Amino acid sequence: MKFLFVVDPIKNINPLKDSSAALMQASSKKKIEVWICTPQDLEARGDEVWASSWRAEVCPWVSFKENKCIPLAEFNCIWMRKDPPVNEGYLYATHLLEVAERKGVKVINKPSSLRAWNEKLGALRYSHLMAPTIVASKVKDLINFAQINHDVVVKPLGGKGGQGVIRLTKDSPGIKAMIELITSQEQLPVMMQKFIPEVKEGDKRIIIVNGEPIGSINRIPQGGDFRSNLAMGGKAEKTNLTAKEKKICTELSQHFKDEGLFFVGIDVINEMLSEINVTSPTGLREIETLSNKSVSDKVIEKLLEII
């Protein structure tokens, strides 16, 4: 059995922190051949897509064994694990992967759903589970929302890991200029949400695999920052799901399965949905460290049940 992981350049992956590394190692333990490429290594020849890929040994970490150009149809599963931004290169890669999908290859996550589910906008499908939210580019609309809700968080729609996220109040000096800047002079929409003060107690990342929540961590902001993202210095703590959080997972899970979203990370603050991460969800390493359980092994086992 062969798995292909479409990832960022391997030198950018920290094997001690990265969920892609955890999934590669779990695959290898199951005697699955692990092959690695970047989106730039994909090419179409007629109706066949190929990958200039490297076969890798990944225990404890990557050592490359051979480089071959292989038709994607030869792989049992392809993991699209390229980190955001979801730019033109990313989108084109999903179209190429879709060719392989039509030939019967399992692609995680489904390419068309990767295109359809912006990680900020996707959550709007479940707005009743969220804090008050607006997505807009007009300064007057965003300022009006801030005045109504007093304390807000502004998120660029294409960001990741807390990058570019700012907090404003209705009385923030220069609020108009700041919104003009983040919307590129009203050319780009942004998400603005009512600030949830309980974020100081944590922002939960919940990993959902084939519709089942299999692990979670609570991320605590550090050093006076309101952002709890691990990439921004947030501290991971062990956690359990509340009854309401389990209900949120249940409501979302069947939709994820229907959309071919096998591996998803959702973020929940004070029992309210914040974001839905489908491109390259993280958190496996931290969950495993805190729970002393190999969650990555369970991910691969659940995948093998459906391919």
From Swiss-Prot:
This protein's record includes keyword Lipoprotein: no
Cofactor comment text: Binds 1 Mg(2+) or Mn(2+) ion per subunit.
GO terms of molecular function: ATP binding; glutathione synthase activity; metal ion binding
Swiss-Prot/TrEMBL keywords: ATP-binding, Glutathione biosynthesis, Ligase, Magnesium, Manganese, Metal-binding, Nucleotide-binding
Annotated residues for binding of Mg(2+): 275, 277
Binding site for ATP: 146-202
Cross-referenced Gene3D superfamilies: 3.40.50.20, ATP-grasp fold, A domain, ATP-grasp fold, B domain
Pfam families cross-referenced by the UniProt entry: GSH-S_ATP, GSH-S_N
GO cellular component terms attached to this protein's record: cytoplasm
Pathway: Sulfur metabolism; glutathione biosynthesis; glutathione from L-cysteine and L-glutamate: step 2/2
Names of the cofactor(s): Mg(2+); Mn(2+)
Enzyme Commission code(s) on record: 6.3.2.3
Record field: catalytic activity: gamma-L-glutamyl-L-cysteine + glycine + ATP = glutathione + ADP + phosphate + H(+)
InterPro entries in UniProt: ATP-grasp (IPR011761), ATP_grasp_subdomain_1 (IPR013815), Glut_synth_pro (IPR006284), GSHS_ATP-bd (IPR004218), GSHS_N (IPR004215), PreATP-grasp_dom_sf (IPR016185)
Protein name: Glutathione synthetase
Organism: Prochlorococcus marinus subsp. pastoris (strain CCMP1986 / NIES-2087 / MED4)
